[in-house]
């Protein structure tokens, strides 16, 4: 495998060089998860899934997020997991630096960096955040990832569109104008007409309406909070930034669509 050639090929179709290097790292890890027999114990989430869904170079992501399913999050278990990836890959995969505990509001997980090298010594580095899939009522579905290391792609467990939408919405509601995840607003717009509304309604109930730490109990309450956020001058300005606006739709259309969509999910 020649990472240098793959970077050149990806930049030719619109990827920035850093994003191309990150995609290589992610795709090597995805392929190794399948090859190592861990596909039933890991579910992929976050930007890697959104990038896979959209197939858009502008939605490329730098980091990787995953949850273990029925697998320990101890450092020993993580080290064993990475050694398994390395043993079942044509590339070298190793942990770079210490494994760090993550504690962010309700989230508990681990962060590590993976150093991945090809046969020519070309190295790429990616950050991997690992958590535990604890909501057993939230089904994980197989998703086909198109990867640069195998034209056949790989099928792995991943968060559904509905779960991704519900989690991004919950984060925005909690943080309000303090949120810096402006790209999430465009992600939710993209997902809004691609979901099963009955499933989404149930997930909104699980993630938001039934959560005692959340204030919102109805679609109207969600819309009131979103309106407050979208009306903030600084938030609006950041939302228009081309760094975050990966869809060629105005931020005003995006926010209006989201408000109307939320009201329709009953």
Language model regions located:
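Structured mid-to-C-terminal alpha-helical surface segments
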Residues: 1-42, 52-60, 64-266
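Glycine-rich beta-strand-to-loop/alpha-helix junction loops that act as flexible
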Residues: 44-48
